[in-house]
Amino acid sequence: MTLSLEQLSARMRQGEDIPLSDTARIALALSIPSILEQLVVTAMEYIDAAMVGHIGAEATAAIGIVSSSTWLLHGILVGLYTAFSIQIAQYLGADRRQDARGVLRQSMLFNLILGLGAAAFGVGISRFLPGWLGADISLQADASAYFAIWSAALPFTMAMGMYTAMLRATGDALTPSLISVLVCALDVVFNFFLINPTRQIQLFGQSVTVWGAGLEVPGAALGTALSTTIGGLLALGVLLLRDGPLCIRKPGSWRITSACLRNLWRVGTPLAAERAALSSAQVLLVRIVSGLGTVAIAANSLGVSAEGLCYMAGYGIQDASIALIGQAVGAHRRDMAKRFAWLCTMMGIGIMALSGMGLWLFAPALMGIFTADAAVIALGAQVLRIEAFAEPMFGASIVASGAMQGAGDSTGCFVLNLFSMWGVRLTLAFLLAPRLGLVGVWAAMCIELCIRGALFLIRLARGKWLDKGALQ
């Protein structure tokens, strides 16, 4: 019988020696729902991208131009709100439930204030952003509309990410997965009606008229915004109505505490800076790619979507590692934190090695899902096969960084990611793009991911990431 995370935490606090088989089972129990969630999410994103891709290469390129900016803005918010879920995991590991509920209440205030501010900022710059990124004039109207609509939904996007992360911190990986799957399914349904115009389709041999708004690229953004709004409200509803360690209906203060702010600064600021550094580097990479032509822009954007099939499994395991190691550190069990870190990291490497093999074998077929443009398919398949070789080490960096974040060592993650992305990937891409085009950009990415994985494994082996200790 698999232990619950709550039972495991109690045994760790009592100083019990937990058998390896039990730790492996609970790691799998937390990882599998998250992995399946990420795979379903990626599959739905494939369908989403395919719906836009079949409008034409220009529609894909319009979204691709602003995609790095959506990563930047969303990434900063993710870095900040991840600090709340790490605090909750460590407090629950220490059996400080009242403190955990206090963090939850403060996170709701944070979500409201920062989410609305980020939405206003994104909508405000949307008109000018495509021009700043060097987009062709023919792409700017669609790119601007997409970014504005996406930005308007940020409070709900943030709520969904924050509250599902907190549910995972309690050991509930299933509910967040179900919410995410529902959101992705709704996204596809909304896109079906919002992207396409009213048309005739064949259903069971009969011609049926299906209504459509015909909004094309703005319709894709609106579908995403509506579905994530529903997801954010569902995640909030679960936390408001559920009993358990985070039952917010129990009496408690909504006052913002100095301890929460200190922990947010200590963990959240480096995480936000890391996301900003990675995402701003992606913006510069898109700027480099935007000078290579519409085919390269479309192949790059769709290639990133296709590669998601590989690394999303790694992020599923990362979610589990943050919760497991956060609770182990909260229980003051360094030995268990190390065990979980290596166990999860090896799982990530193994799964992403297998998915990398699949990426290499099926690269043309994956690109064919998104677009019928032969030139985009050929170039996209070529760069995906380059990237396939980096997947195992990318898995190492994803999961090891989650382990370090769970222990509160977000500064170490920031430094390693900053060096690898800015010192290696951007430098190589700048040098190789004029000579090799998009192939050079993706070769730089492959080299950088291998170096990044090696750096994270070295830091994991040295053990200094555990010196941060439990949060205040």
Task: Describe the residue ranges of each PLM region.
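Alpha-helical transmembrane segments of multipass membrane proteins
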Residues: 46-50, 128, 162-166, 188-193, ...
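Helix-terminus/linker motif at the lipid-water interface of multi-pass membrane proteins
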Residues: 39-61, 130-137, 193-198, 207-215, ...
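N-terminal transmembrane alpha-helices
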Residues: 18-50, 54-55, 68-87, 112-119, ...
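Short alpha-helical transmembrane segments in multi-pass integral membrane proteins
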Residues: 1-34, 88-155, 186, 202-269, ...
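Small-residue-enriched core segments of transmembrane alpha-helices in multipass membrane transport
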Residues: 180-187, 305-308, 418-427
